[in-house]
Amino acid sequence: MQKPLAIFLMGPTASGKTDLAIALRQQIPVEVISVDSALIYKGMDIGTAKPSKAELELTPHRLIDILDPSESYSVMNFREDALREMADITAQGKIPLLVGGTMLYYKALLDGLSPLPSADPDIRAEIEAKAEQIGWAGLHQELVNIDPISAKRINPNDSQRINRALEVFYISGKTMTELTAQQGEAIPYEIMQFAIVPQERAVLHQRIEQRFHKMINLGFEQEVRRLYQRGDLNVDLPSIRCVGYRQMWEYLEGQTSLDEAIFKGICATRQLAKRQITWLRGWTSEIEWLDSLDPENSYKKMIEKVQQKHLKLW
């Protein structure tokens, strides 16, 4: 039995994924699912470059605005939600089009989840108590000794990921690296994968800087200030650690000037884009590459490739 078709449209931030997805929906019977760990949060619209109200009316996106910023969301949560939405779209006779830049989410969909143990509140409390004694940098050094590969990927200030990596080891006796190497259940779809990336990195850097300044003009500082004034959010939450938000939060706490926060936000966004491109360059599955500097040809190429694969869909 032939698997149903699904399409991945991947790419770094500011590469033009949303515009391309909107254009595709006018021509192909697709429904969009967001693959973005920042767009899930309500009230975080400007700094995440969330599609506008007009864009969402034209092309609705699923898995946008599903959580309050105080809530956490795991890769497992995403996989369950995405598979549910994909099944619903397929049942309507349409094609799921998954659009975004959170590469870990795509990997979880393709390969399934590795058998990581569930969280243990008691062990987490022990780790946090130890952090109060020696600091998260000290615990990061402990992780270096236990699981150097994971430690290399985790910032010494990233308390949540350090906690999780140590928790996994304390519960299972195996490192995060060992367990994530074990694949889970693969996705029950035939996947066409596209990646839209500018051929010149300097152009992407320029786009990122321009977009960040545009967000400032649209009221990004005020958006973060509203979150800050709630009183129940902090910089350790995944929502506030999103690029741009963390830097603006530091400004509101008086740690930096506004100009410095903007500069740091632009740098952090460029680093995110670099990581996303690195993920894509190392992707093991077959990818059709699109040039974001040539959106018209990218659009034509996607239409042509999908129609070639499934001529009888139209």
Curated annotation (Swiss-Prot):
Pfam hit, one: IPPT
Coiled-coil regions listed in the entry: none
Annotated EC: 2.5.1.75
One GO process term, biological-process aspect: tRNA modification
GO molecular function, one term: ATP binding
Binding site for ATP: 11-18
Region Interaction with substrate tRNA, annotated ranges: 36-39, 160-164, 241-246, 274-281
Family: Belongs to the IPP transferase family.
Record's protein name: tRNA dimethylallyltransferase
Originating organism: Glaesserella parasuis serovar 5 (strain SH0165)
